[in-house]
Regions:
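A polyanion-binding, active-site-adjacent surface
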Residues: 1-97, 101-104, 109-118, 122-127, ...
C-alpha cells in the first residue's frame, strides 16, 4: 500500500479509482524519475494495481485547485480503518508512507508484521529533500523476495 498523503489536484476529473488519467501528475513524474524509468504518457497505475499495489491517499477527494480542501471531512476515518484492517488481517505488506501526513499513519500499522517505509512527499517542491534516492521500490522488492512473494514490476 502506498499512502501519498494529502493530494492536491490541479485539474478536475484527473483521477479515476486509484489512478491518474491524462497527462501524468507532477508526483507521478517524480516517482518515475526516481525509478529511473521513462515518464509514461499517462499517470495510470493500473499495471501496479494488477500486481497487488494499493495506492491510496489519506484524503480521497479534493476540490479542484484547493490543496487539502477535503481534509478533516471524514475521509481520514475511512482510510485509517482501511490501513488498520490491512495491517491486522494481512502479513508481509509493504506500507510506503510519503509526506508528514501519511507518516502519522504509522501508529495504525503493526510494524512487526509489515515493512513500513517513510519519506517526504514526492511533490516537485519536496522530492529533493528525501524522496529521490530513498530506494523504496527496491527495498519493497527486497522485502517481498525475502518472504518468497513475487516482486513488483514498477
Amino acid at each position: 500500500m502506498i499512502d501519498f498523503g494529502i493530494q492536491y489536484q490541479n485539474y478536475q476529473s484527473d483521477m479515476t479509482r486509484m489512478c491518474f488519467i491524462g497527462e501524468p501528475d507532477p508526483k507521478i513524474k517524480e516517482i518515475y524519475d526516481d525509478l529511473g524509468k521513462p515518464i509514461p504518457s499517462s499517470g495510470n497505475l493500473d499495471r501496479w494495481v494488477s500486481q497487488g499495489v494499493f495506492p491510496m491517499n489519506s484524503v480521497l477527494t479534493v476540490r479542484a485547485h484547493q490543496t487539502g480542501s477535503h481534509r478533516n471531512r471524514g475521509w481520514e476515518t475511512f482510510t485509517d480503518a482501511v490501513i488498520k484492517k490491512l495491517s491486522e488481517e494481512r502479513e508481509n505488506l509493504v506500507f510506503m508512507l510519503w509526506g508528514s501526513y501519511a507518516k502519522a499513519k504509522i501508529s495504525l500499522i503493526n510494524t512487526s508484521r509489515h515493512l513500513v517505509l517513510t519519506t517526504v512527499h514526492p511533490s516537485p517542491r519536496s522530492a529533493e529533500y528525501g524522496f529521490f534516492g530513498c530506494k523504496h521500490f527496491s527495498k519493497a522488492n527486497d522485502f517481498l523476495r525475502g518472504k518468497g512473494i513475487p516482486e513488483i514490476d514498477w
